[in-house]
Amino acid sequence: MVSIRNPPEWGIEPVPSKHRFLRGIDYFVLWSSLGVGLLVFSAGSFLTGARFEDAVLAIILGSVGGSFLLALAGKIGSDNAIPSIISTRPSFGIHGAYLPAILNVMQLVGWTTFEIMIMSKAAEMLLGKLIPYYIWTILIGTFVAMLGVAGPLTVIKNWLGKFAVWISYASSLIIIIHLATTGVFSKVLLSSGSGISFFSGLDIVIAMPISWIPLAADYNRFAKTSKTAFRGTFIGFTLTNILFYFGGLMLGVSDVVGIITAIQSIFFGFLLLILLVDEADNAFADVYSATVSTQTINRKIKQHYLIISFTILSIILSMSISIADYETFILLIGALFVPLFGVVLSDYYIVKHRRYTPSMLYGRDALKIGYPAIAAWSAGVLLYYLLSSLSPIYISSWPAIGATIPSFIISALLYIGMMKSKQRGYLLKKA
C-alpha cells in the first residue's frame, strides 16, 4: 500500500515513479471537481444573450474542445512527470519561463483571493451575518492552507475521492434539476437571444477549461499512466463544465453575489453550504500551483512556507478588494496564458514530436531564452486584447468572433512557422 501521509518536497523535479500512482478515476474526480464552481454559473449566464440552440451547441463544443486542450497540457506533465511551468522551458527557455511563472503566481493569488471572497460572502449571507465577513476569510483561508500543506496526493485521495466530490455531485444535480423544473427552462428555451453570436458564446465556454491549463501538469505529473490521466481529465472536466454552464444559462444571473442569493433560496441554503465545501478545492489548486510556479524561480524555498504566505496574502486581499473589480483584473491576466499554451502545446506535440529530455528541461541543453516563443506569444496576446471586450484596447468594430480561439491559433501557427523556418535554415547551413 502506498503511503500518502507526508507529501514529498521535490518541488519542480520529476516526480519519482513510486509517487506516481494516481489512476484515471482519481483524475476524473479531481478535474470534475475543479469544473464545479460559482464562477462557472456566472460565465454560463452570459449565454442568455444567445439563441438557445446556439448556446447549447457552444456549451457542448466549447466544453469538449477546451477540455481536450486541458488534457493535452496535463499529458505533458504525465509523460515527463514535470509541473506546468517547467513544461514551458523547451520553448521559452529557462530564463524566458520566469515571466510566465511570475504572471502565473499573480493570477493564482488572484484566483485564491477570489475563491476566498465568494466562499466568505456566501457563508456570511447563509448565516445572516452572525459571523463577520473578515472572520470567515480567516477561517476559510486557514482551511485552504491546510489543504495546500497536505498536498495534492492527500487532497485527491482522501478529501475529494472519499468525501467532497460526491456531495458536490449530488448538490449540483439537485440544483440543475430544480432550475429545469421550475419554469426557468421554458423561458430560456423560447428565448430568441439578444445579439451574442455562436462564436462569441463558444469563446465564453472554452475560456473556462483553458483557464486551468497553466495548472494541469502540476497535478497530472502524479499519474500512473498518461493514457488514463488524459481520459479522466478530459471526461471529468467536460461533464461538469457542460452541467454548470447549462445551469448558469438557466439561472441567468451573472453577478456572483446574485448567484449566491439565487442558490441560497433553494432548500433553505443547504445546497449552497454543500457546494461551498467543494469550492475550497479550487482555492487549494490555485495556491498549490502558485507555490510550484514560484519554485521554478527559486527551488530552495519550502512549499509549506510559500503556501502559508500566499494564503495569508489572499486573505488580506479578500478583505480589501471588491469582487467585481478584481474579477476583471484576473481575467485579463489569465488571458495571457491562452496564447502562451498555444506555443507550448504546439512545441511539444508538433515541433518536438512529444520528445522532451531531462537535459532540455533542467540541464545543459536547456535554452536560456526562446525568442521565437516569446514573439509568437506576444502576437497572440496582442490579438487577444484587441478582440476581448474586457480589454482597454478592444476594437469594437471588428467582427465578434471571440478572443480565446483566435489568439490560441495565431500564436501556435506563428511559433510553428518560425521553428520550421529556423530548422530549414539550420539544415541549409549544414549542407
Where are the regions that the model predicts?
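C-terminal membrane-solvent junction of multi-pass transporters and transport-like membrane proteins
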Residues: 14, 343-417, 421-431
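Membrane-water interface regions at transmembrane-helix termini and the short interhelical loops
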Residues: 45-49, 75, 118-128, 141-163, ...
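Extracellular loop-to-transmembrane helix junctions
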Residues: 45-75, 96-98, 238, 406
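Hydrophobic transmembrane alpha-helices that form the core helical bundles
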Residues: 97-130, 280-296
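Membrane-interface loop-to-helix entry segments
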Residues: 120, 135-179, 192-193, 233-237, ...
